């Protein structure tokens, strides 16, 4: 996996976040069109262009500058098949190159251009967090487990630190 990340971010890359998603029949959700806009950090430090601040699961998060978000790469490792019936990711290709969108701008995007990302068990999907994406609820009994890892290649500015780095 490191080779994949280095090919995009260079040899100085490191992991900054990991999330486990487990869509099942009993733990099922739909996610509206959005961009991933926050990073997790160790402590609150005022940096121009960073904010608003939130806490999720006891971890401090902030919306960083567009430059920081543009430098992050996500790899989604699929532990189960992600088929049409178990809530696959849908994306709008190229949208990550256009910056950060307001809710109104997102609602005006041509969803007819969406691509459904079916991924086989053991496969990976690579994306930028700023890519417009959504997912539907699972309509079958089987799970859709995904390990979502985010990578960066630069430290944060002015004394702000990533919450975790590997």
Residue ranges and their predicted role:
Residues 164-166:
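Glycine- and charge-enriched low-complexity intrinsically disordered segments
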